[in-house]
Amino acid sequence: MEKHSIFYAMFIPSMFLFLLGLGFRLSLYLQGTLEGEENATSWRKFVILMGRGWRGFRKKPLWYLRVLISDVIFHRKLYGQSFYRWLTHSLLVFGFVATFLVDMIKGFTTGYLVEWSRSLPVFSFAHAFETGRIRPFLDFSLEFFSFLILAGCVLAIVRRFIFKPDQLRTEEEDIITLLFILFLELSGFFIEGYRIAHPEVVTRRVYMANFTPPSANNWLSFGGFLLSLFLKEMAVDPDFLWYLHVIPSLIFFIYIPHSKLLHIFTSSVTVIADRAKKKPLS
């Protein structure tokens, strides 16, 4: 069975479990009362809140975007409390958001539009994302943003296990989350380094992505390229490495709704709602 089939055979159930967990957490939030709709069902409350949010966004889209960037992603209030905490938060959240966006662009253009361009020439521009001029920017961006996540994770670990502020409580959930992130980032860089050090991995199409552009194998992928210098003599089954990274990634994906990482999603809603109350949208 080819890698695409194996991946989607694992990804689709993972997506279902992720949405199931997200739905469960959402149902807990919707148990509260909604002003003016005290007797509404959970589904009715969800529809009302979505409607209010959409109407507000349509009136002031730039305001919503500004609040999302300044108050959620870069958490400006935290900056005044602790630069270290602010830096850790910003590296992790911005790193995750940026990596997700770039990865979605790369995956959609190189994984779908390139295929569609074979029968629909209108999508031929997508080849610039696969092997053309845009590809080096994608490779470097993914590398850089992944490095930000790794740096933020290390800062969080140092604060929790070395500095240990008196007011900070480290729970088992925090340890699991940080170790998950650390493992996924390190394994990702290791696999990239091994792939660069062993060109036969690319020719055998062990991984799903297209690694033909030179930018995928040189200093633009700086983390993997540096590791590749030490992995040329190492022999590891590349299929094993693929599973070692993909399976924990999907487990982590399922785990998100049940972890404090859900804060990345819920905090944006809470912060924007609070700001909207202080500054009514007219």
What do these predicted ranges mean?
Residues M1-S282:
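Membrane-embedded alpha-helical bundles of multi-pass integral membrane proteins
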